Curated annotation (Swiss-Prot):
Signal peptide: none annotated. The gene is dnaE2. This is Error-prone DNA polymerase. It comes from Corynebacterium diphtheriae (strain ATCC 700971 / NCTC 13129 / Biotype gravis). It catalyses: DNA(n) + a 2'-deoxyribonucleoside 5'-triphosphate = DNA(n+1) + diphosphate. CDD domains: DnaE_OBF (cd04485), PHP_PolIIIA (cd07431).
Amino acid sequence: MVDWVSGVNGKPLKWSQLEGVLSGTYPQEFKLANVGGSGSGSEKIRYYSSQPFAELHAASYYHFLHGANSPQDMVAAACQQGMSALALIDRDGFYGAMEFAEAAATSGLPTVFGAELTLAPDRILTVLARGVEGYTSLSRLITQARMRGSKDVTIYPPLAEIVESMGKNCRFLLNHSWCTDESLLEIFYPDTVVLEYGVTMRPEDVDHHELLDSIRQRYGFMAIASAVPSAVDRVSARVAGAKQALAQRESLPQATPRLHPMGSTWMRGGDELAGSVDKQLLDASVEVARDCAFALDLVAPNLPRWPVPDEMAHLTGLVNARFDARYRGRSEDVKNQARAQIHHELAVIKELGFPGYFLIVDDIVSFCHTNNILCQGRGSAANSVVCFVLGITNVEPISTGLLFERFLSRDREGPPDIDIDIESGRRDAVITYVYDTYGRDNAAQVANVITYRTKAALRDAARALGYPNTSADAWSTNPDEAPNAVRFLAEQLKGQPRHLGIHAGGMVICDRPIADVVPTEWARKHGRSVVQWDKESCASAGLVKFDLLGLGMLEALHHMIDLVVETTGTTINLWEIDLAEPEIYTMLSNGDAVGVFQVESRAQLATLPRLRPREFFDLVVEVALVRPGPIQGGSVHPYIRRRNGLEAVTYEHPILERSLRKTLGVPLFQEQLMHIAVDAAGFSGGEADELRRAMGSRRSVDTMNRMKRRFFAGLRRNNITGDIAGILWNKIVAFVAYGFPESHSQSFASLVYFSAWFKYHHPAEFYVGLLRAQPMGFYSPQSLLADARRKELTILSHNINKSQVEATVENGAIRLGLNMIKGVGKTEAEAIVAHAPYRDIADLSRRAGLGVAVIEALARSGALETLGVGRRQALWQAGAAATEKAAMLPGLSMVSAPSLPGMNAFELIVADIAMTGVSSENPVALLRRQLELRGVIPASELLNCENARRILLAGVVTHRQRPQTAAGVTFLGLEDETGLANVVVSVGLWKRSRAVKVARAVLVRGVVHNADGVASVTADRVEELPFAEMMSAGSRDFR
């Protein structure tokens, strides 16, 4: 019998509908339609087999290192095989439950939820939840076991306690392994036990079934059949087998005696199983499913209520109290507009019922301010005057023309989304505060599902197939050399979940235990607990997420602010900085942006002179412009040409003008593409947001296909057809998936301006702030200090009598800190600073309590030269000095050093770079005379070269970068003593030149491309520069 069926309007089934499906009678409201699955968009048919059957012990790939397929694929297979219901069982968790629920709801397939509990390594208890109450009880039990143990250890209570705590809210699925000890069976309530006849097609099935038969006759337990599948078909079963071998740290050949002959079992419907087991066992599976199935439409916890009688009145009071301080120095016109806007925003917040959300965000931000932690709201919160007044954001929305409706409107579903960037060195303190304030049960971080990428997939595929680790590691970096079998298995693993990680900063906060909705467990990082879902599943369940993100530039800005106070006595408030200083924009237009947030990359430095920003919105554009979305959508060059008056502003269709007017007809921001969906295809705001989320999700193929059909239908209603329709869809796909939201661009643009402001007005403090916040940004300390020298700043070397632990500003110069010296830890550096100054090395050793290794590190770095000894002499004295103790007479163990020659310039640079990563000059400077004889020009001369001229260029490699949007082309960053240069390396040259891949300093022959104030070199030959290995500070390679 064949029929088609879908859910009602894609929504989860009601109980009456669900019961009808389980009993074989199909409600009238079901549509005859295509259903389910996650394939390529082809139509899927739902079959009903002649033998009813519900698979109640299947595993998706969220049973980590066990299952082979996604929940969507498992649901599709169940539908195609005519199953009455499906249970996807994870180990010690509900990792894939929400994805499973969403896929099944779309397909109209009833769902059963459960988990395997690891009571002991050889004792696994499978539990099926009966309805919402059973799900909640099981989630709490898993949480208790996870939190009682550690990241990799789960500690459940004794079996009797599990049975008691679950009561009648579950069914215990017991296979043959539970029947060998009848004392265990006595612990269960008889009416909660279901014996599981595994139909695995292995010879031992016969013996297992005979044992189950005997127990069934003796106790009268209910019994069902199950294929126990961990794959959708035989091909995928091999992948599941490989994963299961990896889980046991074995190869497939080693694990073969314990694995299924085909690797694993796979999905089989009732008709196929009917020849292997009693029909009653198949019928009983439907009965158990009817007893347990429910739609996972959980009632998510609310946000904690703020402890005040009236949350809205409290929020209004906070805004009124802080208004004057935040708007100090603004014009009366701006103040009046801000007051009116606040009245409007508070009305919307009240109407939508979100005052509690703003109070929680304000609480977190206030903690940061109270504890001198720099933070800033990111995203569309920058459009809100309320957020600005509360101190959540630092961009004043009235003067910058930002629209509140892009942040919050009456059409929006769910709470607003405020991401909080926090200086990276203090983010842990903020997260700890959230745990302490809201409770470990009610607050947790969001998970990040770690999936297989190419290298890891190749490595694990090789290990699974029995190859040694050395081969696995080699093939992970050179995939073409791997055997076909390894590459085939790796390709199947790619994109699949491997284990659970932790989101960069997402936290959920609830008014009751999160375990009512999803289990929590310990993260790898000490003191962190995470929910078992990623941000998409949390959003689907209605859990409210707060993003607390670490940002290195905020840490650097904090250092800059503190340094300005130290050097000038002036306190800088970021929100009071004038965003319209022409000098700042001139500096950026000249490409002078090394160290400036977000615009210091190779591509950004090449774009700035072309765009020539003149106002704040230009920086917003600059942040969004050099991104995969605009690049793939072909927007970068058209926008710049139009911005500079070299190309007319046009629109591909008149209906697009409203969405694209502000960016001259060229789509740049993610929101614009959503507006196109609204204007051109008639989407609602909610549909446009659903489209955005679907395109950004790895699991929304079906939703994307549905939205695509809806989009083209909407275009036809507006008479937009043919090529234009296809172009619009392609732009949306490129931008919504990879484009940068304007709301984020606004927030990041403020940090661009703030950091550029410090570079222009307080350059020494700027560079020292960056040094203190390392590692961060695009450039190494060596490149940052070279840029400082080009600004005619003086760099003072490490000095045990003058250096502090970190870099400092000393009379307008940059003094390097002791923490930059390799081999000198923070404790040793603090001891050196605390007891300074020193008379000699022995004095240093005694009073600072330093060992031989630390003194030798100081000697090699030149930090001891202030004592009147060269580096070689200091190394000679280090051993003897370190043997002196504080109680000994000074000089008792000193050995006179012989007369040793000082280091030459080359040796000093080598020693500096080896010990500190920075040198007093660029190594290439030592070769300049020889290079000039060969016709090699300095980087500073590139802008003076004629376009298309062939030149020679030499430099230290600062970066190797191969963006996904560059079709395999690699970009080298080179630096000599005069500046930076960008070198373009073709795919062919990269393949045939070893130097371009590994050399630390290179000599390049190539052709200059010089236009619009930007010069680059396209290389045709690359060779290693002499002595490069010893002279280079190393490169920062990006792939």
